[in-house]
Amino acid sequence: MKSIYKKGAALAAAALMTVAFAGCGGGDKSASKGPKDTLTVGITNFADSLEPTDNYFGWQVMRYGVGECLVHFDSKMNAEPWIAESWKVSDDKMSWTFKIKDIKFSNGTPVTGEAVKKSIERTFAKAPRAKAMFELDHITADGQNVTIYTKKPIATLPGMLGDPLFIIVDVDSDGKVDFAKQGPIGTGPYMVKSFSKAKCELDANPNYYAAVPFKHLVINTIDDPNTRAMALQKGEIDIAVNVAAGDLALFQDKNKFNISSISSIRDVLARMNVKEGKPLADKRVRQALLRSLDRETYAKVLLKDTFIAGGPMLPPSLDYDFDGLMKAYPDKYNAESAKKLLEEAGWKDSDGDGFVDKDGKNLELDFIFYSGRAELPLYAEATQSDAKKVGIKINLKNVDYNVLDGIGVRGEYDLLISNILTEQAGDPEVFVNQYWKTNVDGSNPQNGSGYSNPEYDALSDQLASEFDPAKRRDIIIKMEKIVQDDAATLIFGYPQTNMVSNKSVQNANIYPCDYYWVTKDITPAK
């Protein structure tokens, strides 16, 4: 493991020097001599389409300031009005009625209850993920009111409709406008002028319901985090989203830069394929892998204390008894225990090659990762190094983000790492279901791992119809305990997230949910 740490430190140091030299004299080149009318942002981008119902591409539509939902999440992940000005649940808890603000789409078409109805129905028709979030019965519209009827009580429906999957679009324009290539007709402050995965150019929405601070917006895809930091240093961009931990030191001068950083509600986790016939189907092998990994050192050394070491499913930034679950966590780092568990499971190094084997085959695990987030390759390489010490061979496979979802759904992995929101609907319910609730005939397609626990499923069903916050909290904690006792997932750590801006702009702040990058609140500096 020392070689991995030295390698990581050397790469970070080299990147820092490169950016520092490249940035000499930089940092203020984007400041305009006259009024600033163009905002330029550097991001990492996984979307080659702006169709919001495809994959998770709605996130980019919202991040670019094109789309909005019925509800918005504040800095505490409370749902607040956005396109909807208010909402209420029926007495029987089987429907929710939303009152829609008198606003317009970017093409000037009014946003009515009927328009919202069509948009949500379109999402359900095109996106399997919508059906996995809640069971829709039907929708009615009456003027500026829209009522959503569900097949069973859904306590968190307003929050679910804050997921970018449910961006409200002008369905009648679909076909006249190619949503994938030209972007949907939404209600955000900006509208797409041109789009490619590498670059998106946008103009101010003339029909927006509030002042739009910039006439033009340019989104540059800069997937390499060091290059993204360099671009900000040189003044080529005004804002960099998610600067790597090793580069944050470059932006400490408060006269030139502003760093918005928060403890996120994200996990970096690896799904574990436990299907019959897979090595990780044996709980002892899963436990051995978990105990072989020194996650505390990863957080402190590789990631320079910008992560907290993992254990429970939900991060410490959320109120779900993190300390209690971490204290009870059974699979903390213990390499000797890992070796004993492998031996108990019948895995021994019979040929002296350094890897344990059984029936003539080494214990090998395919680890799928993508490099769009700087920490993922580091975690993957650290896993490979530490697992080798107990005799587990890890085969690393770097893939494009666009194929990651399909790999996960099909279960074509042993380990699959991702950086994911745990409270994407203002509540962890979607997260605790998507990878661990039993997938019955495609009912939960994100669970391609084969994991199934009847007690967990029963709690999930109970959670879906429970409206009392205290009882919901207790149910979720019980679900977390089941997964960690089953050694059913690998939580590497809980990251901070950040947005760094130069002094030509103000109010560039990151939110916990990571949906809101470009907003109407980001304005030219006064």
Regions found by a protein language model. Give the residues of each.
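N-terminal lobe/hinge region of extracytoplasmic solute-binding protein
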Residues: 42-89, 121, 185, 513-515
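Surface-exposed binding/hinge segments that line
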Residues: 88, 92, 131-172
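Detector for C-terminal structural segments
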Residues: 293-324, 375-384, 408-526
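Structural transition elements
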Residues: 309-350, 371-377
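Ligand/substrate-recognition segments at binding pockets and active sites
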Residues: 348-423, 497
